[in-house]
């Protein structure tokens, strides 16, 4: 083993285990992962325990832990920006694939919405601050500071390959990642309990309630509780921050993915030509497309918004209206999922005629994208298979059951074919990677050294070639760079497919993220599995399905740019 650590004197490039720093690389990663796992498990224990009345863990305990974690993470970020990143040769390389502009732009957008949510949350708890714990008012303020500091940090440092304070940086990145995941889980649990509370209010189920004030958690009656949100402004603040939870959830997940890529890049050595092949050129939206994909995608987006609003209005009304709302909701989703499946399949077929080379270079960002796409899809797979079993085994053969079954089957097919299309697209080289064949019938294609008068006499050449004269003293000899770039039909089709799938994934993210829960409005699964089991399945799996949609949007935007 010791002989393997000694580099041969004639070797120009040492192996990965030659340097003692590289030997400790895995140990430093293991230490940071263990730190993140333990912190995250502690946070998950408190968050899950605070969601139920029968567990003696209060929401103030959860807020105190999250506030402490955000303060520590913000302090480390400040140390990184002021000390670590300013060391000599601290960042010798920058990963061109990490932190693309659309990912950082999405992070800023979701961060702004999170700041608005923190303002609403502060106003909500300040409406009855006399009987509230100070930590409830302090928590959204600290979260706003943390969001600002972290967003600035990721905007300027997402591409860093840091080579200073390696172990401290790894631990700091993993701790910050664990903090974001804890915030994500707290938001998901709070939103899920809020949805369960709405369901129990109309069906008499009391196994779940919202995170209540401490006096009520301690056993006080609701009528005697002075900490009630009774004013109009308090109701606005309460409803406002619940509707902004989806943006907070996506912000935490976006930040977590960028932090993981930074963690993978700590101490990474890059070649001087890294990223040159995949640097996207300046593009404009809808350029070099057939417009069919954007138009059809926008049409489905607008129709989906109308269906979502109609569903939310009717599902809270009479029972007959709920059934009608479910039929409309499932019908739209079946049409949308069916079109997305066919379009994804056609994109994979188009790649069979694509001559671009496959990109097999090491790329932590792409590896993470593929893993997240495959992993997040498992949540929707689980819900779909549970629905299929409930419909086939236990439900009567009616229209609602048929729509539910078709929706579940198409959901599985759509996720599968879309993942295949996106993953294959991410592994394709840029358009310039196509092998260029120079047929003998077109001698003027490419770069030709020739006499200018002879070039003008060729009938098959373009009328206005671009000439570059390397030496003014010999004007008769020149370099004629005659480029005839044309956008192939398959490239246009791929751009249309990417935009269509992007818009469809946005509307399919909006519906469940902002409260559409046909899983509970449709009583097939609730009657078959029971409310407690079905609620656990949906509340665990649905957040991954929601994250899948937004992550697919990010990946499809990259596919569009690189097409």
Curated annotation (Swiss-Prot):
GO molecular function per UniProt: proton channel activity
Organism lineage string: Eukaryota, Metazoa, Chordata, Craniata, Vertebrata
The entry's keywords: Cell membrane, Hydrogen ion transport, Ion channel, Ion transport, Membrane, Transmembrane, Transmembrane helix, Transport
Localization of this protein: Cell membrane
PANTHER family named among the record's database cross-references: PROTON CHANNEL OTOP, PROTON CHANNEL OTOP2
Protein name: Proton channel OTOP2
Reaction equation(s) it catalyzes: H(+)(in) = H(+)(out)
One example of a Gene Ontology biological process annotation: proton transmembrane transport
Tissue-level expression: Expressed at higher level in stomach, testis and olfactory bulb.
Transmembrane regions: 30-50, 62-82, 100-120, 137-157, 173-193, 242-262, 290-310, 325-345, 373-393, 403-423, 496-516, 528-548
Signal peptide start-end: none
Domain of life: Eukaryota
Family membership: Belongs to the otopetrin family.
Alphabetized InterPro entries for the sequence: Otopetrin (IPR004878)
Pfam hit, one: Otopetrin
Organism field: Mus musculus
């Amino acid at each position: 083993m010791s002989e393997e650590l000694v580099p041969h004197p004639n070797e120009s490039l040492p192996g990965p285990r030659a340097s003692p720093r590289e030997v400790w690389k895995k140990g430093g990663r293991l230490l940071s992962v263990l730190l993140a796992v333990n912190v995250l498990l502690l946070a998950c224990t408190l968050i899950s325990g605070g969601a139920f009345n029968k567990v003696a863990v209060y929401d103030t305990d959860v807020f105190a832990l999250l506030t402490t974690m955000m303060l520590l993470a913000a302090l480390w970020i400040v140390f990184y920006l002021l000390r670590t990143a300013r060391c000599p040769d601290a960042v010798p390389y920058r990963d061109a694939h990490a932190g693309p502009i659309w990912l950082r732009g999405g992070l800023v957008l979701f961060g702004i919405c999170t700041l608005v949510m923190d303002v609403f949350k502060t106003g909500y708890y300040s409406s009855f601050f006399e009987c509230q714990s100070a930590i409830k008012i302090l928590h959204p303020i600290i979260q706003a500071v943390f969001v600002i500091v972290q967003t600035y940090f990721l905007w300027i440092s997402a591409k860093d390959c840091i080579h200073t304070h390696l172990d401290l940086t790894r631990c700091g990145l993993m701790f910050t990642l664990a903090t974001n995941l804890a915030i994500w889980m707290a938001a998901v649990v709070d939103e899920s309990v809020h949805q369960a509370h709405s369901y129990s209010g109309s069906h008499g189920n009391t196994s779940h309630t919202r995170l209540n004030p401490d006096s009520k958690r301690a056993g006080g009656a609701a009528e005697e509780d002075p900490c009630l949100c009774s004013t109009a402004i308090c109701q606005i603040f309460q409803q406002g921050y619940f509707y902004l939870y989806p943006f907070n959830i996506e912000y935490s997940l976006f930040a977590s993915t960028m932090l993981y890529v930074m963690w993978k890049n700590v101490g990474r050595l890059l070649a001087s030509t890294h990223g040159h092949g995949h640097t996207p050129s300046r593009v404009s939206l809808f350029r070099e497309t057939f417009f069919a994909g954007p138009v059809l995608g926008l049409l489905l987006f607008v129709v989906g918004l109308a269906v979502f609003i109609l569903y939310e209005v009717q599902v809270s009304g009479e029972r007959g209206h709920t059934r009608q709302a479910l039929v409309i909701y499932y019908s739209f989703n079946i049409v949308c999922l069916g079109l997305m499946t066919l379009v994804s399949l056609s994109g994979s077929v188009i790649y069979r005629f694509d001559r671009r080379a496959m990109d097999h270079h090491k790329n932590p960002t792409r590896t993470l994208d593929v893993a997240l796409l495959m992993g997040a899809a498992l949540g929707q797979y689980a819900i779909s298979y549970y629905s299929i079993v409930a419909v086939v085994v236990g439900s009567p053969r009616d229209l609602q059951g048929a729509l539910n079954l078709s929706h579940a089957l198409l959901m599985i097919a759509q996720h599968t074919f879309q993942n295949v299309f996106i993953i294959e697209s991410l592994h394709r080289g840029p358009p310039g990677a196509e092998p260029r064949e120079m047929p003998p019938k077109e001698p003027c294609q490419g770069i030709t050294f020739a006499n200018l008068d002879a070039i003008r006499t060729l009938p098959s050449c373009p009328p206005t070639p671009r000439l570059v004269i390397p030496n003014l003293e010999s004007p008769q000899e020149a370099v004629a760079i005659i480029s005839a770039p044309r956008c192939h039909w398959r490239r246009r089709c791929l751009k249309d497919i990417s935009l269509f799938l992007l818009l469809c994934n946005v509307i399919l993210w909006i519906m469940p993220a902002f409260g559409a829960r046909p899983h509970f409005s449709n009583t097939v699964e609730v009657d078959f599995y029971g409310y407690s089991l079905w609620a656990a399945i949906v509340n665990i799996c649905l957040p991954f399905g929601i994250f899948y949609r937004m992550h697919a949007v990010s990946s499809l935007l990259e596919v569009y740019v690189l097409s």
